[in-house]
C-alpha cells in the first residue's frame, strides 16, 4: 500500500520516529514535511537523533495566521497527492498540518488515517480543538490512544472506523528510553543529577500566552517535585 504521511511540527516528528519505521517494513511511505516547525532545534535534530526518515517532500510553509498557514498548506499538498497517488494519507494529532493534510486528502477522495483521533479539550477557542474535530470527521480510519477516545467519536457519530491502538508516545518512550538513559551528556552539561529533576515542555498558546495559566503550571510542577522527591 502507498501511504502519504504529512508531518509539520516537533511532536509529529517524534511520533513518526516510531510509526514510519514499522510502516516502511510492509508499505511504501512518502513523508511530507509542511515546514510548520522548520529550524534545527524544532525539526532537523529529530530526523538526525531519532533516525526519522528524511522527508521526500518539503513544502517550507511557516508563519502567518492559522487560517493563512492552513490555506497555503492545503494548496501545496493538493498537487503532492495528485503526483504520489497514495492509497491513504496519514496525519497525526491536531496541528494546521493535520487539518491541511486531512482536508486535501478528503477532497481528492483519498482515505484519511488519523493517529491520536478522538482527543478533546472541549474548548473551541483552541485552534487545535478545531483541527482535531474536523480531521476526525474527515477520516476513514481513526486510531485512538484510549477507549475513552473511541467512545467520544461514537458519541459524535463519526463515519470512519475508530480503533483503540494505544498511545503512540508510549511506543516512542519504549523505543528511545534506553538510549536517552544511556546518554548522560545533556545532564552533565545542565549540571543536574539523574533522577533529581523534572523536565517539562509547554508550547500551546493557551498554556504559555496567559501569565496566570503559566504560573499555575509552574506551581503544579513545584508541587509534584516536592511531593515526589526528598528535598530536605
What is the predicted role of each segment?
Residues 37-53:
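N-terminal beta-loop-helix "entrance" segment that forms/cooperates
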Residues 1-36:
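N-terminal subdomain of nucleotide-sugar transferases
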Residues 4-7, 13-19, 46, 58-157:
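Active-site and donor-binding regions of nucleotide-sugar-utilizing enzymes
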Residues 222-232:
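Central I-helix of cytochrome P450 enzymes
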Residues 213-223:
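Short hydrophobic signal-anchor/transmembrane segments that target glycosyltransferases
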Residues 2-4, 30-31, 113, 141, ...:
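A structural signal for isolated positions on well-ordered beta-strands in alpha/beta enzyme cores
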Residues 37-41, 60, 138-213:
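A nucleotide-sugar donor-handling region in carbohydrate enzymes
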Amino acid at each position: 500500500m502507498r501511504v502519504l504521511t504529512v508531518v509539520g511540527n516537533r511532536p509529529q516528528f517524534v511520533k513518526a520516529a516510531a510509526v514510519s519505521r514499522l510502516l516502511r517494513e510492509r508499505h511504501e511511505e512518502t513523508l511530507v514535511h509542511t515546514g510548520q516547525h522548520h529550524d534545527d532545534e524544532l525539526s532537523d535534530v529529530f530526523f538526525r537523533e531519532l533516525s526519522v526518515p528524511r522527508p521526500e517532500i518539503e513544502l517550507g510553509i511557516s508563519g502567518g495566521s492559522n487560517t493563512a498557514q492552513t490555506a497555503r498548506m492545503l494548496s501545496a499538498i493538493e498537487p503532492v497527492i495528485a503526483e504520489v497517488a497514495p492509497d491513504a494519507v496519514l496525519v497525526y494529532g491536531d496541528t494546521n498540518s493535520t487539518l491541511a493534510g486531512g482536508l486535501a486528502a478528503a477532497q481528492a477522495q483519498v482515505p484519511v488515517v488519523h493517529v491520536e483521533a478522538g482527543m478533546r479539550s472541549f474548548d473551541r477557542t483552541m485552534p487545535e480543538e478545531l483541527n482535531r474535530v474536523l480531521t476526525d470527521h474527515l477520516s476513514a480510519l481513526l486510531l485512538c490512544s484510549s477507549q475513552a477516545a473511541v467512545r467520544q467519536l461514537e458519541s459524535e457519530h463519526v463515519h470512519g472506523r475508530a480503533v483503540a491502538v494505544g498511545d503512540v508516545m508510549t511506543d516512542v518512550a519504549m523505543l528511545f528510553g534506553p538510549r536517552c538513559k544511556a546518554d548522560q551528556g545533556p545532564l552533565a552539561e545542565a549540571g543536574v543529577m539523574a533522577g533529581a529533576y523534572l523536565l517539562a515542555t509547554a508550547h500551546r498558546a493557551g498554556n504559555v500566552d496567559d501569565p496566570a495559566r503559566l504560573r499555575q503550571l509552574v506551581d503544579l510542577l513545584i508541587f509534584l517535585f516536592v511531593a515526589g522527591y526528598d528535598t530536605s
